[in-house]
Amino acid sequence: MNLLVFFCFFLLSCIVHLSRCSDNNSYSFEIVNRSTWLNIAERIFKGNAPFNFTIIPYNYVNNSTEENNNKDSVLLISKNLKNSSNPVDENNHIIDSTKKNTSNNNNNNSNIVGIYESQVHEEKIKEDNTRQDNINKKENEIINNNHQIPVSNIFSENIDNNKNYIESNYKSTYNNNPELIHSTDFIGSNNNHTFNFLSRYNNSVLNNMQGNTKVPGNVPELKARIFSEEENTEVESAENNHTNSLNPNESCDQIIKLGDIINSVNEKIISINSTVNNVLCINLDSVNGNGFVWTLLGVHKKKPLIDPSNFPTKRVTQSYVSPDISVTNPVPIPKNSNTNKDDSINNKQDGSQNNTTTNHFPKPREQLVGGSSMLISKIKPHKPGKYFIVYSYYRPFDPTRDTNTRIVELNVQ
């Protein structure tokens, strides 16, 4: 019985071996034992054609009752694969590398672009164009919408070297009107007396900055100024902004400590009354080493809509200066400073003498992460009115996780 099985197996192997000569996808079956494995391995490693191998214990194939004592033999099934080293033409056919190509001899610099590379390139352009159309559509909807807008990075770089304005970077989209570049981060309503952050460019600046963009319609990082609605004449207001800039060393007329840090996404509004040219110091608790930073996100005339997903993904370090109000970005309090007092409004209201916050979360003490520290931001209003100053304690690389937002509603008389 075993002899008959072996003969049938040998005959099948011969048939498969003969078909492999003409078929590039054929299989081969071989019995491998201690006396033959070295020769088979040598032939495999010396060969140039790629193979796919499967090994099955031969004693199980030969006799499932394991009556055969030869337990060291295995059945090796190999499959020839297509030679991927040969190039592929545009019709997805393999080009024989042995054929002579006279065109390559005439032009050594010519390269054959396969169908796969061209498809990927076309899909990349389509994807970029689709994303660009979605951005333009979203911006047009926001321009025509008078509802509240999400808070995001309101800072921008100065187009000239005038340091009277705040500087930063942001990505902007070039629309049909080359004299007006607007982004969802900078759009404000024209009817609700909010600050309007529209970046203005002339044709020459845009043409020079578009330069070497790879995908049509994309504009590199642009530099722009911040303008408020009241600044109809930006050139005239530049001198006023210089005089309105807040000195970081200016003494505090009033000291406020904002609410406690909570381990979840939350938002809190603190109402404060002040007077013109009165310096209000905001003390902010911070925990070192956890990636969270206190950031000044904006100044508004109406309460903005808070959306952490639109927060800047890069750390903002700029302060805010305008003819109406000046606000410094939070910075660490010097060790010898006397601004860390206990006469804070929130300290009295929230009971800061306890070791836990009103939400039963531990306060940032020395035993937490890398220790606690105190930051300070100074606010100086130059004109009466109501202002909403937005601070946020969040991770720039993960703005939607445990973001603490504090909005100072400042009523200036």
From Swiss-Prot:
<dbReference type="GO" id="GO:0020009">
    <property type="term" value="C:microneme"/>
</dbReference>
<protein>
    <recommendedName>
        <fullName>Falstatin</fullName>
    </recommendedName>
</protein>
<keyword id="KW-0732">Signal</keyword>
<dbReference type="GO" id="GO:0030430">
    <property type="term" value="C:host cell cytoplasm"/>
</dbReference>
<dbReference type="GO" id="GO:0044409">
    <property type="term" value="P:symbiont entry into host"/>
</dbReference>
<feature type="region of interest" description="Disordered">
    <location>
        <begin position="325"/>
        <end position="367"/>
    </location>
</feature>
<comment type="subunit">
    <text>Oligomer; probably composed of 10 monomers.</text>
</comment>
<keyword id="KW-0646">Protease inhibitor</keyword>
<dbReference type="GO" id="GO:0005576">
    <property type="term" value="C:extracellular region"/>
</dbReference>
<dbReference type="InterPro" id="IPR024321">
    <property type="entry name" value="Prot_Inh_falstatin"/>
</dbReference>
<keyword id="KW-0964">Secreted</keyword>
<dbReference type="GO" id="GO:0005829">
    <property type="term" value="C:cytosol"/>
</dbReference>
<dbReference type="InterPro" id="IPR036331">
    <property type="entry name" value="Chagasin-like_sf"/>
</dbReference>
<feature type="short sequence motif" description="BC loop; binds and inhibits the active site cavity of cysteine proteases">
    <location>
        <begin position="284"/>
        <end position="294"/>
    </location>
</feature>
<feature type="compositionally biased region" description="Polar residues">
    <location>
        <begin position="325"/>
        <end position="339"/>
    </location>
</feature>
<keyword id="KW-0789">Thiol protease inhibitor</keyword>
<keyword id="KW-0968">Cytoplasmic vesicle</keyword>
<dbReference type="GO" id="GO:0030133">
    <property type="term" value="C:transport vesicle"/>
</dbReference>
<dbReference type="GO" id="GO:0004869">
    <property type="term" value="F:cysteine-type endopeptidase inhibitor activity"/>
</dbReference>
<comment type="similarity">
    <text>Belongs to the protease inhibitor I71 family.</text>
</comment>
<keyword id="KW-1035">Host cytoplasm</keyword>
<feature type="signal peptide">
    <location>
        <begin position="1"/>
        <end position="21"/>
    </location>
</feature>
<feature type="compositionally biased region" description="Polar residues">
    <location>
        <begin position="346"/>
        <end position="360"/>
    </location>
</feature>
<comment type="function">
    <text>Cysteine protease inhibitor. Inhibits cysteine protease falcipains FP2 and FP3. Required for the invasion of host erythrocytes by merozoites. In the mosquito vector, essential for the gliding motility of hemocoel sporozoites and, therefore, for salivary gland invasion and the subsequent transmission from the mosquito to the mammalian host. Required for the invasion of host hepatocytes. During the liver stage, may prevent host hepatocyte cell death likely by inhibiting host cysteine proteases.</text>
</comment>
<dbReference type="Pfam" id="PF12628">
    <property type="entry name" value="Inhibitor_I71"/>
</dbReference>
